[in-house]
Amino acid sequence: IGFINYFFPNCKIIHCYRNAEDNMVSLFKNYFPSQNMFWSSNLTNTVEYYNLYSSLIKFWNQQYKNKIYNLSYETLVSDSQNEIKKLLNYCDLEWDDNCLQHHKNFKTPIATVSLTEARRPIYKSSVNFSKNYSDHLAEFFAKLNKIT
């Protein structure tokens, strides 16, 4: 973030985050073919990596207090229109009703494990889904450094 801000001092930085437990379970249960994501196939590594990320984003938020827009995934899916309007305002962009129709506007292919989700309307079923695993993963959840 420091590098980006140095070369693009007027840039807008958006940090989208979600519930730590949901994030951890999602990372672990999805297969990522990239060698850069090898750590996500091990719960201990996933917790360590998440905690490094959490520390790093806290550092950058302290360095650039008003420069980073922190967008909660849970808030985005529960109040999409209002949250998207806030995000657009931060980016100095105008509201367009198509912002809520993203799933109908694909013109280019996307390569992500979330391909099917990206082509659906915004949905809430992934919020707090980690509770289904809490009995089995409590020791890992307890080690997560929450962002909020």
Enumerate the language-model features and the residues they cover.
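Conserved adenosine/adenylate-binding substructure
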Residues: 1
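Conserved phosphate-donor/acceptor-positioning beta-strand/loop module used by diverse small-molecule
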Residues: 4, 8-29
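PAPS-dependent sulfotransferases, especially Golgi type II membrane carbohydrate sulfotransferases
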Residues: 7, 27-70, 77-148
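Structural signal for conserved beta-strand scaffold positions within catalytic alpha/beta enzyme cores
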Residues: 15, 70-72
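Short, glycine-/Ser/Thr-/acidic-enriched flexible segments
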Residues: 20-21, 75-78
